Design a protein with these regions (language model features):
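Long, contiguous bundles of hydrophobic transmembrane helices that form the permeation core
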Residues: 189-240, 247-250
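Transmembrane helical segments that form the transport core of multi-pass membrane transport proteins
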Residues: 232-340
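Juxtamembrane and boundary regions of transmembrane helices in multi-pass small-molecule transporters
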Residues: 32, 154-155, 164, 173-214, ...
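Membrane-interfacial helix-loop connectors
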Residues: 110, 121-134, 139-141, 147, ...
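Central hydrophobic cores of alpha-helical transmembrane segments in multi-pass inner-membrane proteins
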Residues: 14-28, 43-54, 72-86, 123-127, ...
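Structural signature of hydrophobic alpha-helical transmembrane segments
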Residues: 5-19, 64-77, 110-119, 178-188, ...
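Flexible hinge motifs at transmembrane-helix junctions and intramembrane kinks/re-entrant loops
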Residues: 21-42, 64, 90, 220, ...
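Transmembrane alpha-helix boundary signature
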Residues: 50-68, 80-95, 108-121, 291-300, ...
Length: 421
């Protein structure tokens, strides 16, 4: 078998091409891209040459990546299916305090059912709560910031990058040590939201505010049987059940949810398999094409000059802003392993082959900065689509980046100075 040093740099090109297509196609050719069949064809075409190359030269590395893919999809699909069986209805008074509390609760829930599950569970109730108000365009934006991204930083269940880290050997409870970064970032962004929403609330007419008060309906949650299935998934990950039993139990939990949850409830929740199918076909291509790049990064990563925690935070986050944050995490995790091997530990602990200060920076960068654009993390576009469906005026792609540039970038600079300088 060829040695890793024989891998040509061009072998990393399909990975970059595929991620660029994921970023560009929804904007350039939305009608083509909206069909999962077309996504699957594109992913297959781009990844096929690398698949053949790896089968011929590095079958073991390919097998490891495909094993990670199966574990990754088992977790994502089970959380998506189970959370889709929980329906939250009702309409409470849409004050800045209530909205801020809604987002804070969503940030906590994201660590249990994932950012995708939390987003799908909570976005419609939050929009319904604010439906009588007119000045609400900022609400989906902050929802994406907090619930769809930053919130899911404390467990491997929270966001796909952290689960991939767990598969690479990061202990399940280690991510709880990111609590200071998580709390500080949330505190800043929630404070900005509260101030922003307070000004927006003052612009509402008295008529709309009266409509909001008279339209109050108590919050009700249906499908709570699914909490048992969620607990099953959490426990099987938390207690580090080995593969393939871990994945089998996740599949059984999802199947149980599908069987016992009334179809009418999922219909009310507008549940479909479209989003998870999209993730499955695209990530099949990603997990194949990223193998050579990760091998190259591990081999030559120290030559890139990225060695400090703040560099890893911004490089991981910057790439995660425009490409998907899960494979970005893996790429920089591999780079950090190379840096740790070549430059030493500096007396710091090592987790899954990575110096702990670098691992903190990579984890926070991947999770937090997936919020910088609509394409940084899977739930972002889904939240945007649901908001538009409910006639909420949300910013376009670059308008959203103006929000993130104004709010998130200064926040991340502060976080860098406190934790990663």
């Amino acid at each position: 078998m060829p040695h890793a040093e024989s891998i040509p740099l061009l072998a990393g090109l399909p990975f970059i091409v595929l991620l660029l297509l994921i970023a560009i196609m929804p904007l350039a050719f939305p009608h083509v891209w909206e069909k999962n069949k077309n996504k699957a064809i594109i992913a297959a075409i781009v990844s096929l040459p690398i698949l053949v190359y790896l089968l011929a030269n590095f079958p073991t590395e390919l097998a490891h990546s495909l094993k990670d893919y199966m574990s990754f999809m088992a977790l994502l699909a089970s959380l998506f299916i189970i959370s889709g069986g929980i329906l939250m209805t009702g309409d409470v008074k849409a004050t800045p305090v209530v909205n801020t509390a809604f987002l804070a609760v969503g940030a906590v829930i994201a660590n249990v059912i994932g950012t995708t599950g939390a987003s799908m569970l909570l976005i419609r109730p939050m929009l319904r709560t604010n439906s009588e108000r007119k000045h609400t365009g900022h609400i989906p934006v902050f929802f994406i910031f907090i619930v769809s991204n930053i919130g899911g930083c404390l467990t491997p269940l929270g966001d796909p990058p952290l689960f991939l880290g767990y598969l690479k050997g990061v202990p399940f409870t280690w991510t709880l040590r990111l609590f200071p970064e998580w709390l500080a970032t949330l505190a800043i962004v929630l404070t900005v939201f509260f101030v922003w929403d307070t000004f927006a609330h003052r612009k509402e007419t008295k008529r709309d505010l009266r409509r909001d008060e008279t339209g109050i309906v108590p919050i009700r949650i249906k499908g709570l049987i699914n909490a048992l299935f969620l607990a099953g998934v959490v426990l099987v990950v938390c207690f580090q059940t080995p593969a393939p039993w871990r994945e089998l139990i996740m599949v059984l939990m999802a199947a149980g949810s599908l069987i016992v949850t009334p179809k009418t409830l999922r219909k009310q929740n507008r549940f479909t398999f479209y989003p998870i199918t999209e993730v499955a076909v695209l990530f099949a291509g990603i997990f194949v094409t990223m193998v050579p790049l990760i091998m190259l990064l591990h081999l030559k990563g120290a030559e890139l000059g990225v060695t400090q925690p703040w560099q890893f935070f911004w490089w991981t986050g910057g790439v995660s802003s425009f490409l998907d944050n899960a494979p970005t995490y893996l790429a920089f995790h591999s780079l950090a392993q190379s840096v740790t091997e070549n430059l030493g530990t500096g007396g710091l602990a090592v987790i899954s082959g990575v110096r702990v200060d670098l691992l903190r920076a990579i984890s926070c960068g991947a999770v937090f900065m997936g919020a910088n654009t609509y394409i940084g993390n899977g739930p972002n576009f889904m939240v945007k689509a649901i908001a538009e469906e409910q006639k909420v005026k949300v910013p376009h792609f670059f308008g959203y980046m103006a929000y993130s540039g104004l709010i998130l970038i200064p926040t991340f600079i502060i976080i860098t100075l406190i934790f990663f300088s």
